[in-house]
């Protein structure tokens, strides 16, 4: 997906280097210097330039349809936000959100904007290939997107207060057809909106438009001077937009004929970054969005919530009086006195003594190889108007008064005086000391004679010239130097900083890039989750340094996770008592599970800090529960373990043999760990015994356990976890432990930690509890999911029953290596992984809703969406052998997925109807991919785990 950016001219030559992106995926240009094209003309210019750069030999109509593109308009003079004019507002650094995990310390507006636009375009139907958006807004949506209709123009809007809508474009729809645009208005009055409200609904335009190839060609045609190929001023919103809809305000036959769909952005939030005020107010609004202290991870309390400091060294104490303060890429020394309503950017390391008045901002811009420009300004300045007009303000006073206060005459100002933006009033110097004197004279000390002399002597440039000639590489180098120091401080001050909530994959790369020493191992009194993050970060840094000990560090992180989960349970010790007659057998059996939405969100550590949501169903195979366990007493005081399916047997005579359960692939790891948890090992027993034999003697018999897993390994149906639950359930009954089904599931999670296989809770809950259910857990080390049963109509009704197909692919893949990879990403707060997991949690709620409504088609489509999400999380989910099977039958399905971690095992398919199901059966039976592949009859289990006695 290509990104096309319209940027300030000075930025386009170094954008790729500064942002470390490639030229293929990112295309940059700027509007022709001196010409105003508007958003419509600018779109035409941007697309034409990209077409010429990548495929000049191909016709435009062919080229536009080949690929999806995101266009961001981010040029302009930035008069009302001078501090980020030179580098473009779209690259404005944005502070880490106090309540969010997985963000990068170096994030900017562009990196925050893009994920939503990519989500939209990934969901857009074929033919809708071009998304257009503005570069000075941040739009958030945490909810799943609705389906995007196949219209020529699709626009997103927000439900807002009418007073806010008067400052923006507004989509107006008839109340009877809310999804269809009736007409569009630009900045309507409150009276206008009130008059419309009886018959119409209105949404505020948030500037996200998707255009079909046809709509793009019409837009481009309107952007050209009639009869020429010259681009003229044409606005996407006020010209093109007003001609859209069923009753458009502007008549234009070709545009009028375009179909339009209006979509409210689900859970949408709109933050504007167009002015100095908005830089602070929008950032404050984002930070203030979450007040629940349980979601705010750091323990620092700022003296004022509207203080934002990033990429900077500050050596002054701040108080509640320093409201609306923004410091970025700057050194603020001990001798500075700050007020409120101030933006300080670009200030190099200095020894200045300066008293900055309220509302006064400082921007220092590197220019050339070693010079700086001093640009102080007022927070309310708009950099507009002739210098001799009383309405033209600079540093919050009329410009003429600023001149008078400093004894400057008109002869002292060379060049243009008709527009403050173009006036050469900002001095250029090489000395940082002189820079400080100039700033003092220009802001708070107008009588400072030395400052006046320096100003008169210096070459001076305008705001326009600053943007055109700023040395952005030097600006970024300074920012990186400050950020390097910030990394050290954040790591050292981890208890009160955002350090361990950051994207630690990015942090590891930065530590290596800046050649920083590794963070120390945290002390044992640190919070368990912080200690886990710390060890995994250290492991990642060591891996980047090709240090062979990185595996040990990684294992330390996993061990801390196990200790955390075991810590909660280790207090629950057991005293097993023989609870059967000498000739009785306890028989446990369980179904397996298919997860249809939210799988992976149940996996620690993600579920521990975010909670999980999963929809899954318990199924029997070929009419019976496939996992079975038999427990009976034996006369000898030892433990005999047998596996029918593996043809294996082992006799255990001591604690050492019993606790040797960490070998992956061992046929008896599960029963050994289960017996340990049941109190047959010192760590989990209420009593102390000198030996296992002595404990069994006190117990009253030896134990014989026989396992039968009538299902292949690596099936993806939660076999190992549910088998563990079945063993625990049978032992629970045999030993009179009085555990309920929730206890059994909790112990299963601990058992998997003992085995070092990891894993979440959805497998055991899916098999132990019957039917189809929504499972939800809260954050915390003690994971006790709430079980909500969903109706089984879609699985048992004759219209749908035969549409659920289960096919064994004959391909296997062990989940442990997949788990370790994804869990490492969770430990490291990988931003893309966390975003996807949050989407998967929300998707589980959509799936639950579809089942509650008995909407079969929606259910099937959502299963397909789950499969797409699983592949995004792990690229090995759909190997070529599996993809080849799917290719044969996909046209007959509403959705399909490999249950569990994927990569092999069983393929679950939702056929469009019983006839399609018949076709799928025929195709895969006739064209089986290997001798083991076969259909298996699946039925919904109405019992879950069952335990009975002979």
Roles of regions detected by a PLM:
Residues 46, 113, 556-564, 674, ...:
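Stable alpha-helical structural segments in soluble proteins, enriched in small hydrophobic residues
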Residues 71-74, 131-134, 156-159, 212, ...:
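Short beta-strand segments
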Residues 2-7, 28, 35-58, 137-138, ...:
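Left-handed beta-helix
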Residues 64-66, 85-86, 92-228:
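Conserved core of the sugar-phosphate nucleotidyltransferase
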